Structures are given as C-alpha cells and as structure tokens.
Design a protein with these regions (language model features):
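A short, hydrophobic, proline-anchored segment that marks a local hinge/packing element in signaling
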Residues: 106-116, 124
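Short, small/polar residue-rich loop motifs at catalytic or cofactor-binding pockets
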Residues: 41-44, 105-107
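Regulatory sensory and allosteric helical modules in signal-transduction proteins
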Residues: 52-59, 65, 71-96
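Short hydrophobic alpha-helical segments used for membrane anchoring or interfacial signaling
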Residues: 47-51
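N-terminal leader/propeptide and maturation segments of large enzyme subunits in energy/redox metabolism
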Residues: 2-14, 154-229
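Accessory "access/gating" subregions that flank catalytic or transport cores
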Residues: 200-272
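Short, basic/aromatic recognition patches
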Residues: 18-42, 78, 82, 94-100
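Gly/Pro-rich active-site capping loops and adjacent beta-alpha segments
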Residues: 119-177
Length: 272
C-alpha cells in the first residue's frame, strides 16, 4: 500500500468490522422493509460496500450469488454515470444481464457516498424482484423463449433517484411493465432505503476516524485480502488444471450446455 497514513491493528480491526456491520445492516434494513416474500423471507438479495474507485471492500452475510456480479454492475453503472456527474442522494438502477445481473429480476442499486463534496465510496444492494415482465409471471420462462427481449424489461443503468428525489417518470415505466407493481415498487424503494441507511453509517465512520484513516484502511483491507488469496493459491502445485461440467438445457429439444475451463498455476500464487 502507499503509506499515506499508518493505522494501528486495533483501529484497522474496528474500521474493518464496522464496514462489515454496515453491509449487514444494509441487508437487515432491506429485509425488514421489502414487500415481496422472496426478499423478506427468502433472503434473495446481496449487499456490499465499495471504495471511491469502485472496488469492493465489504460484503453483507446474505446470498452470495449476486456478489460475484456486483463489482461488474457497479463499474458498468459508473461508465454511464461517471463520479463527477453524481451528487448526494443519487441512486443508479440496473438489471441488464449483459452487464452482470444474473437475470432481469435481479435489480442492482448503487448509491454514491459523499462527505460534503468529496466522494468517499459507494453502497450497493441487489434484490430479486417478484416480476419484471416478459412472457410469463416471474420473468423466468424458458420454454419457447428465443431472445432476451421475451424475458422481461431490460434496464440499462438509469438514475432512479436524483438528489434524493425519486424519478417518478422512470418508476412509472418500470411499474407499467411488471405484473405485481405494488411489490416491485415496494422492493425498489426498500433497496433505496437500505442504501440510505448504509450511506449514513459510512459517513459516520468517516466522521469518527477521518477521511485519510478510513481510505488508508480501504487499501489495507484490499492488500491483505489479495495477500491471503495469493498465499492460498501458492499452495496449489504448479501445473495445468482442467474441469468441465454441464448446465441444464434451455428448453425442449436442446442439449445441456457444456462449460469448460483450463487454469494454469505457477506455484507462486499466480494463475492464468
């Protein structure tokens, strides 16, 4: 890490655990305010915190299925809305599978966090919506579907909330294309509310410890995580490892989909 500021181990541990607690509170808020059973009872959602460079620094202890895609979704959102165009209270919404969302029912919301005018990070959450339109209720029909346009409403990154105010025009477009608009609206607003809670907690952390200290902790967390992963990979004997498996077919008369991967380990913690 670039030694901008030294952090003692106790302070680092407190900051790190606070970030994890914020990510967990984000999810708890989402669960308690959601309208749909899938989110309230099925825990089909994920939460995370990101630094100002959109690198994940903390995860909530919820569904891991969305977390692998979340960094990609955040980066795509920022390609559409660069940091210098964002303002406090904004929220970016997307569900595009080509940008990382698993399928159209999975909506991601990303909120920038500012200390005065300085961007200090992002909070983000995903939630599986009960319906996003398409050929069948639930927006997961496979039989007879030949293209993504039949699957449901595809949302490229849009600013659902601008400066703390819901963009009702965008909300109406979404709700006009789903089968259960009350639950979808409720869950979208629950995601926004949960992000608001997490954003305030993150601002409190920065106020308590100072911007330089928390940003230095960000970097230490990332470096230590990388070091731990490289140490684990270095224990794998050098060589080429191959694996293949099959996904389910995608409808009547179709074959299972083969997935194959080759990974080369050099015995020093690097992979190809």
């Amino acid at each position: 890490m670039t030694e901008q500021k030294q952090i003692d181990p106790i302070t680092l541990t407190v900051i790190w655990n606070t970030m994890l607690s914020i990510a967990d509170e984000l999810g708890t808020t989402l669960r308690h305010t959601a309208f749909s059973e899938g989110v309230r009872e099925g825990d089909d959602f994920s939460t995370a915190l990101f630094n100002s460079d959109a690198l994940m620094v903390a995860q909530g202890n919820f569904s891991p299925g969305h977390l692998g895609a979340m960094p990609t979704c955040v980066k795509h959102a920022l390609n559409y809305f660069p940091a210098d165009l964002l303002q406090p209270g904004d929220s970016i919404l997307l569900n595009d599978s080509f940008m990382g969302s698993g399928h159209f029912p999975d909506t991601f919301q990303i909120m920038p966090v500012f200390i005065e005018t300085r961007l200090v990070g992002f909070v983000a959450c995903s939630a599986h919506q009960v319906d996003m339109g398409g050929a069948a209720p639930g927006s997961q029909k496979v039989h007879g579907v030949t293209e993504s346009f039949q699957e449901g409403l595809r949302l490229l990154p849009v600013r659902l909330v601008r400066g703390g105010n819901i963009e009702e025009d965008i909300m109406r477009i979404i709700l006009g294309n789903v089968r259960m608009p009350e639950k979808v609206r409720g869950d979208l607003l629950a995601q926004h509310t949960a992000n608001l809670t997490a954003a305030e907690r993150l601002r409190e952390l920065f106020r308590d410890y100072g911007t330089d200290t928390v940003e230095a902790a960000y970097e230490l967390i990332l470096n230590r995580s990388e070091q731990a992963m490289r140490e684990a990979l270095s224990k794998v004997p050098a060589g080429l490892y191959s694996f293949e498996d099959y996904l389910d077919d995608y409808g009547p008369g179709t074959e299972p989909i083969k997935m194959a991967v080759d990974i080369t380990f050099n015995g020093k913690g690097d992979v190809e």
